[in-house]
């Protein structure tokens, strides 16, 4: 660190938020949430122990819809009842002087039906992920696509209510946002599919509503 002293200097974001240094902890899945997506005390203490010396902590991805959890022990931000638990994480991080960021996502076709009570996953198109045993998802209707965008916006509202300093949108790892952009998983023939510009509409709409 002594050979790169700028890393430890404060950094001010364009919106005026000052980070104590330029170190960030990436969002790493712990699979320690309750079965219903609520926060455990172990998870709160996990983040408390890592806060303080690092400038910003990005908390592991939170599903924005109850069809969206991609792994066991995932935490959610899909309803207002989840806010209280998430607020404990944000408070623990900020009490140590670090900024708290929450990553939000939807797993789309990468969701195992067993994680959502045996229901069929949803995705841009009814095309299964290229992996053994993957379920064929149900294609979202146009109205459901609009509703999903709104759910990302609601996720941001809840993150702010919980006291987080910011939100990171998870648009990688072949989850729902990336599924809309890829022609391998998006073969829709409406305004949300087809051309690259149309396939980019969902990611851009999510960005717009969460900005």
Task: Report residues per predicted region.
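Aromatic- and acidic-residue-enriched carbohydrate-binding clefts of CAZyme catalytic domains
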Residues: 64, 77, 113-140, 180-200
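Substrate-binding cleft of carbohydrate-active enzyme catalytic domains
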Residues: 93-94, 153-167, 208-211
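Alpha-helix-loop-beta-strand connector modules within alpha/beta enzyme cores
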Residues: 74-101, 181-211
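Feature marks short, surface-exposed loop/turn motifs that line or immediately flank catalytic pockets
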Residues: 32, 65, 108-110, 173-175, ...
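Active-site glycine- and acidic-residue-rich loops that bind
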Residues: 35-38, 149-153, 158-160, 191-205
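Non-globular sequence segments
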Residues: 99, 105-164
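N-terminal capping/small domains of soluble enzymes
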Residues: 1-105, 148, 156
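Short beta-strand segments at enzyme active-site cores
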Residues: 57-61, 100-104, 162-176
């Amino acid at each position: 660190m002594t050979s790169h002293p700028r890393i430890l200097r404060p950094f001010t974001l364009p919106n005026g938020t000052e980070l104590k240094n330029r170190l960030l902890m990436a969002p790493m899945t712990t699979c320690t949430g309750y079965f219903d997506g609520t926060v455990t005390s172990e998870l709160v203490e996990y983040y408390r122990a890592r806060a303080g010396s690092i400038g910003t902590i990005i908390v592991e991805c939170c599903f924005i819809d109850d069809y969206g959890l991609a792994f066991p022990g995932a935490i959610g931000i899909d309803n207002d009842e989840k806010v209280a638990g998430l607020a404990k994480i944000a408070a623990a991080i900020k009490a140590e002087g670090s900024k708290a960021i929450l990553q939000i996502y939807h797993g789309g076709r990468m969701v195992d039906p067993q994680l959502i009570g045996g229901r069929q996953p949803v995705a841009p198109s009814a095309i299964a992920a290229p992996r053994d045993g993957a379920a064929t998802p149900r294609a979202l209707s146009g109205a459901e696509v609009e509703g999903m965008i709104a759910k990302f916006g609601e996720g941001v509202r809840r993150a702010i209510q919980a006291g987080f300093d910011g939100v990171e949108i998870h648009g990688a790892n072949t989850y729902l946002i990336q599924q809309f952009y890829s022609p391998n998983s998006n073969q829709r023939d409406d305004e949300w599919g087809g051309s690259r510009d149309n396939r980019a509409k969902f990611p851009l709409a999510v960005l717009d509503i969460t900005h």
